[in-house]
Amino acid sequence: MNNPDDVLLINRFLRQQHVLTLCAGSGMDMWCASCFYVFDENQMALFLMTEKHTRHSELMLINPQVAGTVATQSRTIALIKGIQYRGDISLLSGDAEQAARNRYCRRFPVAKVSSAPLWQLNLLEIKMTNNALGFGKKLHWSRVEPL
């Protein structure tokens, strides 16, 4: 069972940030990328835009299981906040792609000129470190219902 207080803090953090590190892999081939994202609180999903021909996208098409981080860049240890996540990612199409594109372009207007595809990263598990609540304080969330 997810702690509602943890969920509120995790959601707030994900809404406030906009860049994630995405790690994809297949067999012994692994690659990471930094991507802008939009958070969908209702689906506990992140929408991101990246071309299909990139190394990380090619890996995601082979193996949709990904992991990554979202972190602040605080110089003060007492203020460090960040998320480690794992999830499943898929290339969007049709109405779902258009809805995600509209939402993404509202957050990042420069993306309106891009035809790069949109992806949906369904979060499965999150561990958040929030030193503002006490050094090393961890918050957790995991998906309880199947996708």
UniProtKB/Swiss-Prot annotation:
InterPro entries: Split_barrel_FMN-bd, UPF0306. Belongs to the UPF0306 family. This is UPF0306 protein YpsIP31758_3570. It comes from Yersinia pseudotuberculosis serotype O:1b (strain IP 31758).
